[in-house]
Amino acid sequence: MTSIAEGLFKSLPKPKYTGEEEELPQHGQRGPRIVGPGQLDDTQIVLRRTGPPPYGNRAGWRPRAPEDFGDGGAFPEILVAQYPLDMGRKGTQSKSNALAVQVDAEGKVKYDAIARRGHSDDRIVHASFKDLIPLRQRVDMGEVSLDRPSEEEVQAQMEKTKNALASLVSGAVAAQKPKNVKGGSRAEPTFVRYTPANQMGDTSRKNDRIMKIVERQQDPMEPPKFKHKKIPRGPPSPPPPIMHSPPRKLTAEDQEAWKIPPPVSNWKNPKGYTVPLDKRLAADGRGLQDVSINDKFAQFAEALFTADRHAREEVRLRAQMQQRLAEKEKAQKEEHLRALAQKAREERSRAQSRASHSPSRGRSRSRSYSDASSRSRTPSEDEEAARERERIRRERRQDAERQLRQSRMGTERRIQAMAREQNRDISEKVALGLAKPTQSSETMWDSRLFNQTSGLSTGFNEDNPYDKPLFAAQDAINSIYRPKPQADFDDEADAEGEMSKIQKSNRFEVLGRAKEGFRGAADAEERSGPVQFEKDTADPFGIDSMIADVTGGAGGAGQKRYGIQEAEPDSRGSKRARVDEEN
């Protein structure tokens, strides 16, 4: 067991502090140490020297304490602030707020020094709880004497107060008295004892006399007897010696360097001298100035040029990209419209082929039909004809309403409407006033004539002061085919005659190979009148019409309509057809 304890103690480090009293090391001791002569070394003896060090050993030395100056003054070769005998030094009172710790007779810290800071010693400062207790209730009441003072103390205090008041009053009165009036105050008389001496051999005894010496009375109104003269100022202290180099003769270079040109003004020449330009430039001092241009200007200009070039390149690339996107979008739109047109032509051709196999209804709507032919029609054909007439009336009414709205629109609204509807023929553009014909040579002017003085004001073309005709679009409107509103012809002969006249006119041959026609136009059915646009039907396969026919045949006549529900185009078809026939 002991071997284990010894091994454990050996493994532990040596403790720094123990509970026993031990000697502190030399560096931890404070204060003077008493050593024997054997422990003292010559290298440890340091003698304190007063006064400045000898010459040659003053490198880095600065006088700080009064002992450093010795019995002399400041050292001029040391360029620091020096105060021998503290002459010229400002008050050494510290500006710090730190206070020295003070204790009372009992060894307690006197914290009232904080409250007394900045006050005089005779000022009463209450800084403890004891000062708040009345004198009669204090514990040390017996130590304070409250007896009446004696007569001697009262007289001494009264005399002291009287003298203090008299000094204050006399000072105030003396300040009000004039200072330059004579005889204002007379000195007290002086008494002198006079004993006469022996004169002329007289040896008799002489009596002493008491003489009173009084200051002579002065007239306060007497003018001054002497005139005050100002004493001239004495000679000043001799000037300090100035060390000059020995005189030497000036060389030609020195004379040229010291040659100062006379002042030459650029605005005044009262004497009228003729000063050459080189002398003016020499007097101006421009040759002495070194003009230098900073390189930053060139760098800044180059940076601006590079930034501008990059910006223009970015704008160009952006514009090209936008143009490509617009062209691509336009091509897609044209392709879509072309596909729709092709689809419409194919549907129209199929409808034409189906209509050719079915019995023809005829194109004429004349009133010469007989009652026998009308009676021979089946009810289904009459209803179909009435439905077709109702559709045509509805389209005409919509066209009339659209034309009325367009006539009330402004030019900007017309342009916006045309932008929304790009796929319109030239007749509608002419109706809107957007198709401008090419001006003839008579209405075109040379722009160079407008810059000359000879013009309308000098009698040129006085009869026609307008550069454009008033109705520029009227010629284009008259030259473009516009079908008449009443497109219904009386008979087939009139329709065939109108068609033959249009075919013989050959109006559009100037535009190209018009006889061959356009691609897909041969499959389209013949058209009489203006181009009629077809709307997308909600029922392309005819399912709704088939259901309507079935429901109409079963009990459609007995259906009841509510509110503003429109009547079915199939209902009362026979009556509408009969009315149209009567008309």
Swiss-Prot record:
Transferase recorded as keyword: no
Compartments reported by the entry: Nucleus
Biological process (GO), any one: mRNA splicing, via spliceosome
Domain of life: Eukaryota
Keyword Nucleus: yes
Biased composition (Pro residues): 233-244
Cellular component aspect of the GO annotation: post-mRNA release spliceosomal complex; Prp19 complex
Pfam families per record: SKIP_SNW (PF02731)
Main subcellular location of this protein, as a coarse class: nucleus
Keywords attached to this entry: mRNA processing, mRNA splicing, Nucleus, Spliceosome
Composition bias type Low complexity, residue spans: 367-377
InterPro entries associated with the record: SKI-int_prot_SKIP, SKI-int_prot_SKIP_SNW-dom
Region called Disordered, residue ranges: 1-68, 177-253, 321-424, 519-583
GO MF term set: molecular adaptor activity; RNA binding
Biased composition (Basic and acidic residues): 203-225, 325-350, 386-424, 519-538, 569-583
Protein's job: Involved in pre-mRNA splicing.
Quaternary structure (record): Associated with the spliceosome.
Family that this chain belongs to: Belongs to the SNW family.
Protein name: Pre-mRNA-processing protein 45
Naturally occurring in which organism (per UniProt): Emericella nidulans (strain FGSC A4 / ATCC 38163 / CBS 112.46 / NRRL 194 / M139)
Gene from which the chain derives: prp45
